Amino acid sequence: MFSRDMTIASFDPELSEAMEAERRRQEDHIELIASENYASPRVLEAQGSVLTNKYAEGYPGKRYYGGCEHVDEAERLAIERAKQLFGADYANVQPHSGSQANAAVYLALLQPGDTILGMSLDHGGHLTHGAKVNFSGRLFNAVQYGVCPDTGELDYAQLERLAKEHQPKMIIGGFSAYSRVVDWQRLRDIADSVGAYLLVDMAHVAGLVAAGVYPSPVQIADVTTTTTHKTLRGPRGGLILARANAEVEKKLNSLVFPGTQGGPLMHAIAGKAVAFKEALEPEFKAYQQQVVANARAMAQGLIERGYKVVSGGTDNHLFLIDLVDKGLTGKAADAALGKAHITVNKNTVPNDPQSPFVTSGLRIGTPAITTRGFKEEECRELAGWMADVLDDIENEDVIARVREQVTQVCRRLPVYQQG
């Protein structure tokens, strides 16, 4: 028998200290990693609930275990809210991650050895879009498209040429480090011209899409995948959406379970359900509009300080800083900003001369700082602090000054307010 008074702190102080230290870090540091955000207390409550105890292999109404009537309702809520939020005809909320969602789609619609055409990791794509080190590049014949070297924008002409040359079974749209609007219909037209499926991985912009501030691919692509965190601000997890096609839906369901997963994580699905409800509220659109406004303010502030932003700006929640001309590596810049309590991630830039472990760029994202209340004014100020550090990364006095400025703004704009 368990007592509700049991705590980690009293039983496992080492783990408790690590957890508390991470809580303090999130409150005291500025978070600019584009794939990170802060889940609401409601989402955290769902993930820490008794639903974690329940095994529920199968789908609502068709489980392999008894006692699933209540978790069935939680999953049905998540499914219906996802469909409403994104205007989808089909939703599968069981994937444990975006990568698992992509794997299920590939295995549902392709055969090993088939050709896929996805965005190069070096140009802003994702590991699961055909990178050689990933299952997608090992199981399939992966051809990669990229961005124009002059503009930093997606090279549709190259994409179309590669599609005609290689006749892929699937074209993958979407990205992990691209700051402009993608023309989903143009990708659809290219896919149709070669008889390919179109899969869009909108993991990075799902929240923007849900709010109507970024074009939706859901009724254009055959299948759309996403994570449920990032801009969507839910629990870490995956989601598959599709337009009506009974044959495709059946294949997708069977490749999620039993094809690639066993029991779903019902506490995570409950977290998804409440996050989708939050995203259906009017204030979510205002939040996403602010995310984009903040990204644009930061990008412009850094450009004005002499820093090169790939493609010259942003239309979404992120942008890339190209440090080649500054003689800086992404690794060194990441470390210097980290000492000032500004958390970023080093990132490759198009035609990067450095290795992926060093890089020549930084990826900057605004979802997390917008959640804690940053507006354009704070973002312009933050861009200035970053430039101060990057202008002289060995100057400990500058780093100390910026760290104190970061502390002050974090105290003024906490992530989780008390009371």
UniProtKB/Swiss-Prot annotation:
The record marks 229 as: Plays an important role in substrate specificity. Signal peptide: none annotated. Pfam families: SHMT. The modification N6-(pyridoxal phosphate)lysine is found at residue 230. Keywords: Amino-acid biosynthesis, Cytoplasm, One-carbon metabolism, Pyridoxal phosphate, Transferase. GO terms for cellular component: cytosol. Its EC number is 2.1.2.1. One of its GO terms (molecular function) is pyridoxal phosphate binding. Gene3D superfamilies: Aspartate Aminotransferase, domain 1 (3.90.1150.10), Type I PLP-dependent aspartate aminotransferase-like (Major domain) (3.40.640.10). Its main location: cytoplasm. Pathway: One-carbon metabolism; tetrahydrofolate interconversion; Amino-acid biosynthesis; glycine biosynthesis; glycine from L-serine: step 1/1. It catalyses: (6R)-5,10-methylene-5,6,7,8-tetrahydrofolate + glycine + H2O = (6S)-5,6,7,8-tetrahydrofolate + L-serine. The keyword Chloroplast does not apply. (6S)-5,6,7,8-tetrahydrofolate binds at residues 121, 125-127, 355-357. Belongs to the SHMT family. Catalyzes the reversible interconversion of serine and glycine with tetrahydrofolate (THF) serving as the one-carbon carrier. This reaction serves as the major source of one-carbon groups required for the biosynthesis of purines, thymidylate, methionine, and other important biomolecules. Also exhibits THF-independent aldolase activity toward beta-hydroxyamino acids, producing glycine and aldehydes, via a retro-aldol mechanism. NCBIfam families: PRK00011.1. HAMAP family: SHMT. This is Serine hydroxymethyltransferase. It comes from Alkalilimnicola ehrlichii (strain ATCC BAA-1101 / DSM 17681 / MLHE-1). The gene is glyA.
